[in-house]
Amino acid sequence: INAGLVGSEMCIRDSNENGLLDYDNIEQIANLHSPKVIVAGASAYPRQINWLAFRQIADSVGAKLVVDMAHYSGLIAGRVYDSPLPYADVVTSTTHKTLRGPRGGMILWNKEEYTKKINSAIFPGTQGGPLMNIIAAKAQCYIEANTDEFKDYATQVVKNAQAMARQLEQYGIKVLTGGTDSHIILIDLSDSKYSGREAADILEKNGITC
């Protein structure tokens, strides 16, 4: 939860003992601090995020809602993960990761009042000359993401992750949240002889990136 675009800022990682987001507690925190902007998103949360709940929390305190969907954008394009676009004021994402595009990003918004501010903040604020090859690569990325083949791909990505989560549990490895709705699996290694870093190195050598 971001308490202001300029000024104090709070990062809230709120979940219950199962690792699931506790929206009631997030609402209590928002009511306590009255943020101007709430930023919702995750890099290590395997379940569906309730974007409507975040919208309602933001509205209850008069905050803007910004969503970072970088890790889920490909699954959202593939219609296997809920989209934040109907609920957020502004949405940001990378174009690589699950969207399979070139390294880069995008910003989406649904109100004309944001257009001038966002555009001027990007150029000339933070960006110089655009790379035309990257723009072309992004266009191709979006074309592919709008195909039935990409939807099939996204569906299979989630099925593969869910199958892996089940197998890990069968081998006695605790999977946080009890499974996954996405491409992300979180495991609890507190009772393991391996640290998180050691496990990540072993997995990377076998073609699985952590």
Regions found by a protein language model. Give the residues of each.
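Active-site C-terminal subdomain of aminotransferase-like
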Residues: 88-194
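Glycine-rich ThDP/TPP pyrophosphate-binding loop and its adjacent helix/strand module
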Residues: 52, 56, 60-63, 167, ...
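Conserved PLP cofactor-binding pocket of PLP-dependent enzymes
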Residues: 205-210
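Active-site phosphate-binding strand-loop segment of PLP-dependent enzymes
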Residues: 15-69
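Conserved acidic residues
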Residues: 9, 36, 89
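Active-site-proximal loop/turn and secondary-structure-junction residues that shape catalytic pockets
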Residues: 43-46, 71-73, 97, 181
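Single conserved hydrophobic/aromatic residue that forms the stacking wall/gate
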Residues: 1-12
